Design a protein with these regions (language model features):
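Class I SAM-dependent transferase core
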Residues: 24-56
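Class I SAM-dependent methyltransferase SAM/SAH-binding core
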Residues: 74-76, 80-124
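Conserved alpha-helix/loop element of class I SAM-dependent methyltransferases that forms part
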Residues: 52-69
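A short glycine-rich, Lys/Arg-flanked "PGG" loop and its adjoining helix->strand segment in the class I
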Residues: 146-161
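N-terminal auxiliary segments of SAM/dcSAM-dependent transferases
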Residues: 1-30
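A short SAM/SAH-binding and catalytic strip from SAM-dependent methyltransferases
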Residues: 133-145
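A short acidic, Gly/Pro-enriched loop at the edge of an enzyme's catalytic core
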Residues: 124-134
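Substrate-binding/catalytic lobe of Class I Rossmann-like enzymes that use SAM or dcSAM, i.e.
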Residues: 175-264, 268
Length: 286
């Protein structure tokens, strides 16, 4: 007989669930460990089958902006280890940070002993090691902006660099169904308080917006039909339960419909409400 004992686990953050789902989806359908956006160029048609290629281009884009002379790198929010593996393949010495046990385990499985993974939040990282470059690839938005630069500077070698590739909130008017990201104005204001010089600042919103078009297409042509089918099934088989659910969870259901199935999560709104940027900063110790 199997062991049906349930083990009490600590609560799992919803972001971790989303990333773990993304990993399972990518591995099963594309044999890919990438969890970040794709970087879409004119020669790559926007389609779900081309997503792995666009994600590889995203990693290549980051690597192309690593300054000369960099030898050691800290990859903050390493996901499943795809970027770190690519970096070690180019002879960089890489360590990584991951607060998610599921993703950290996956990263260890593909990196082996090539990379030490700190299984902690970046804000809580404590090590004597220092690095030539710290990379935040779609992880910057999850870190306290009031603490991130002070913490990063602790682990930078003299004259080291910080590379951020992530999206930020713009000052566009109106309500956006697209969450995430620090305010871009706050980001620039915060930078001014630290001994950092912006060496590169590139807007890649146009090249990353097609990812949202793919998500919207999946929501409209897969997510919404499945959602409606579920409601039709429950309503037909259990009408009283259906009425209770609609009454009890009315506001949450309306929010889900508005956020995911209204068609507002599209590339046009992404380009309006978000600014996706690659920002490279050099430390300028006084």
């Amino acid at each position: 007989m199997g062991d049906n004992t349930r083990v009490c686990r600590k609560p799992v953050d919803s972001k971790e669930v989303g990333l773990a789902f993304g990993l399972i989806f990518g591995k099963y359908f594309f044999n890919s460990h990438h969890l970040h956006y794709g970087y879409w160029t004119d020669d790559v048609p926007v389609s779900i089958t081309n997503l792995p290629r666009a994600q590889e281009q995203y990693s290549d884009f980051i690597i192309s902006h690593i300054p000369l002379g960099v030898k050691t790198i800290l990859d903050v929010g390493c996901g499943a280890g795809a970027l770190a593996r690519k970096l070690t393949g180019k002879q960089y010495r890489v360590d990584a940070v991951s607060p998610c046990a599921i993703l950290a385990a996956e990263a260890r499985s593909i990196l082996g002993d090539k990379c030490h993974i700190y299984e902690t939040k970046f804000e809580q990282l404590d090590t004597d090691k220092k690095y030539d470059l710290i990379i935040f690839s779609e992880s910057f938005q999850y870190i306290d902006i009031g603490r991130v630069f002070e913490q990063a500077l602790r682990f930078l070698n003299k004259g080291g660099h910080i590379l951020i590739c992530d999206f930020f909130k713009t000052e566009a008017k109106g309500e956006s169904s697209l969450g995430g990201g620090h305010r871009l104005t706050e980001f620039y204001e915060t930078l001014k308080r630290y001994p950092l010089i912006v060496a590169t600042d590139i807007d890649i919103t146009k090249q990353t917006a097609p990812n949202i078009a793919l998500v919207d297409d999946m929501l409209q042509n897969f997510g919404r039909p499945v959602w409606n089918l579920l409601f039709d099934y429950v309503g037909g088989r259990h009408p009283l339960l259906f009425k209770l659910i609609n009454w009890k969870l009315k506001k949450k259901i309306e929010k889900i419909n508005r956020k995911y199935f209204s068609g507002s999560r599209n590339s046009q709104n992404f380009q309006l409400f978000k600014s996706y940027r690659l920002v490279l900063c050099k430390s300028n110790p006084i």
